Amino acid sequence: MSHRIAPSKERSSSFISILDDETRDTLKANAVMDGEVDVKKTKGKSSRYIPPWTTPYIIGIGGASGSGKTSVAAKIVSSINVPWTVLISLDNFYNPLGPEDRARAFKNEYDFDEPNAINLDLAYKCILNLKEGKRTNIPVYSFVHHNRVPDKNIVIYGASVVVIEGIYALYDRRLLDLMDLKIYVDADLDVCLARRLSRDIVSRGRDLDGCIQQWEKFVKPNAVKFVKPTMKNADAIIPSMSDNATAVNLIINHIKSKLELKSNEHLRELIKLGSSPSQDVLNRNIIHELPPTNQVLSLHTMLLNKNLNCADFVFYFDRLATILLSWALDDIPVAHTNIITPGEHTMENVIACQFDQVTAVNIIRSGDCFMKSLRKTIPNITIGKLLIQSDSQTGEPQLHCEFLPPNIEKFGKVFLMEGQIISGAAMIMAIQVLLDHGIDLEKISVVVYLATEVGIRRILNAFDNKVNIFAGMIISREKLQNHQYKWALTRFFDSKYFGCD
């Protein structure tokens, strides 16, 4: 369903390590690099984070049955160098058949090649959901049984590129309006027949006579009447024969250039989130930094000591994490109840914490440092996982996978855990994932041990200052200008905690 290809070395150099080189990012005040961000122009304007999967690049590939659409689509998917590319076949949207139509289908008397045979309304709804960054379910169709597979769907979320292929991919105006690039694969109908016979007999268990009968009665007439005219809707027409390599490569290069522009724009927006007017973000009532008590300061000192061994580091971090979590739990949902004391006295309308209304989502892997403390604080808590990593070439954050508790939107409080926040890019993306799953922003609380002011500023600007952040230690911009605090720009907590340093 998705393809992970090694990144190309030919990248725009001005964007390499924008989000990874935290020293440059912070000391230049989310700096204006290569003229990419004008702080004066952004002053007074509100910024809002738009994740890359909210604006996926959608490619439609149409053509007659057997023209080679699937081969062209597979070539594009394997070459465009985007990990989260989804290939969707319109064959999955064939309408389910009743008993009579199924009997006709097995006799090769049912017309699968007319437009009404495909549920284009459902196809449009699913593609629109992907275009809007929402989770969607793609049905699965079985040509062996001539029906949709019961209770089986392909769940898609977070796609950056969507490739739609099918005989009517370029037919419906609503689908065409969602596409960024439309391709028609042209082939002689005799070639289409030969390919179709090979495919249907080998892959779909059909007999030769039935295939030829269906071709002459339904496939060929509909190809001439309905499919061929969709050629006029295409942005590019390529031949389906073996000599189409040049045409396909030209299209692939065009797609790559468009995707690189899209990636660069994503990075520009992330940088812009940190370029708001220099107001004091650390004094807002939604930012909660652990009070610097003697115990807390001592724990900070021990955790930052290079000579502390792994076992002691884990012990002291768990201790500090428990303090931090206990502080964050002051805000959890409560209910009123009646209890009986050990002395058999009744207490009415007292407050009880609803721990079953609390869940946590760890950002792998630094968020996993909180696992022990979470289990000690709320033993039966449900925990989800998100894996977000930066592209090694561009620094762009990318969602690799998400494992969230069922019905997570019904919880009253969701803790989003991370060991360190430096640029804030991964946390911003993680919050957006939760929002896409129906969680109210007010229910989300970020829990982090170490954070920079730059990262916090980005998070607040991305979500209109509505995210509560509980931090063990926050490093201000002024402190970062002091070389003694340069250690705060290096990720080390998860490596130290898990003994990987």
UniProtKB/Swiss-Prot annotation:
Any one Gene Ontology molecular-function term assigned to this protein's record: cytidine kinase activity
Cell compartments where the protein resides: Cytoplasm; Nucleus
GO biological process, one term: pyrimidine-containing compound salvage
Domain of life (superkingdom): Eukaryota
Residues that hold ATP according to the record: 63-70
A GO cellular-component term linked to this record: nucleus
Main location (coarse class): cytoplasm
Job of this protein: Catalyzes the conversion of uridine into UMP and cytidine into CMP in the pyrimidine salvage pathway.
Name assigned to this protein: Uridine kinase
